[in-house]
From Swiss-Prot:
Protein origin, superkingdom: Bacteria
Membrane-protein topology: Multi-pass membrane protein
Record localization: Cell inner membrane
Pfam families per record: 60KD_IMP, YidC_periplas
Entry protein name: Membrane protein insertase YidC
Amino acid sequence: MGPDNRRILLATVLSVGILILWQVIFPKKTPPKPAPTPAAEVAKPAAPAAPAPGAAAPAVPAPPPDAPEETVKLAGKGFEATLTTYGGALKSLQLEGDKFRKQEKDREVQIDLVHVTAGQPYPLSLSASPELGGAADVTADPGARAPMRIVAKDASSVTFEGRVGNLAARKTFRVTGKPYELALDVELTGGAGNGTVGVLYPAFMPPDTKSGGIFSGPPLDFVRPVCRAGTTTERFDLAKEGAPEKLEGQVSWAGVDQHYFVAAVLPAEPVGTCTFARGPVKGAGVAALAIPVEGGARKLSLTVYAGPKDLDTLRGYGRGFESAIDYGAVAKFFALFARGLLYVMRWLEAIVRNWGVAIILLTVLVRLVLFPLTYKSMQSMNEMRKLQPEIEKLKAKFGDDREKMNLAVMQLYQKHKVNPLGGCLPMLLQMPVWFALYAALQTSVELYREPFLWMKDLTAHDPYFILPIAMGISSFVMQKLSPQPADNAQAKMMLYFFPGFFTVIMLFVPGGLTLYIFVNNLLSIVQQQLMMKHQRAAPTPAAGK
């Protein structure tokens, strides 16, 4: 490779590496957005329907305000939901199975997709103030946690009755038999005229929680309210302060995004508005679906999905639900490629029954696909290696005159029809695969907590740093086998600094990506050794011919 071209490649790789390292070691909090238009400037809709003068009182009496809490558990496919009489809502939803566990202090617990704090309503509670004229209207709406009565229950369903503002409300939760799914039927009666009721999905996250950087994924407990309107999926930042925000259009679902998981409510038909408000404490907020109530009554069928972000499952719901998978700023560019890699790895994992082995086989497949190009590249590198004696003579001839020496080296390459950029090709071809695999590891729940050898989770970094060190050693060997630049200082940097710097970066990235790069390095070394052995008997080009 020509000296100038090596400098360009080295500068590019180091720049990307420094950016990756900075983002991984110093993950930033989510930056604040510009303050939205205060909801006070938006015309508020009519209040919830009130009974007409002289109309009969609703048949459903309100429970005493100090009624003790009752809970009911429903076991669904892959989850256990705990429902509470406080708001007739979802108090807990724990995912089942060893895969869906997380470390909490000194023990492992099941992942719970309900994240609320004191004073917040529970998910799927109803509010008489869905348009959020002020944060206190709904984020701390006492009516949203008002006690309801359990009027019916069995092994697969529970029905609550109570009041929402001036409306009588009947809510029935049912286990559908589908993975991670509940059905919620709502019946509102006893009003007059037109109004609006909100279906709430609150969330809470400690304010000091880091969101991750461009190249570093968010922690497992990083949560954000999310809404889908038309073709836009908007995630709301719980860390910042500001007035309520409105998402207008055909709102098809709303809920809470939690890295590899999503909990969302999907109405049978799109509604007109999703509103997000912060409070009652910092780090807390709620997304509300505004449901029109016409003529003082409304029946509503809702689907609740709370589980892993499996791409095929989310696509099965339609409504753009697969956009719940957030590929991030950089990874989004490689999203299609990442999905392709994931499908290949799924196929391989179905055969070998281990995701680590599937990544190794993926590495082999990619090498086979790229073999024609990498073979030509290594041929070019071997031709450059044969010219090393001539390059040494030029170094002795021109001494410290680097400009003349570099010019003479380039003329030597041209004379023997050697492409100095050929050695860059293997790395350049692999970089899109690296980014796509990184995107797959950060967004694909299939790989979450999947073990390989000493690693318990391929989506997390190697806890013992064995793979990064092995990868660094293999990178050093690769550099030793590559033709060295004529510039001694540059040669030392390529030989020592580059593998060392790359090793430091790999300390903090998912173990699955480090495994891929390490195996790819080993295959490159083997291929290079075989080619060198095959071409060792070939005559060295003469400078004067």
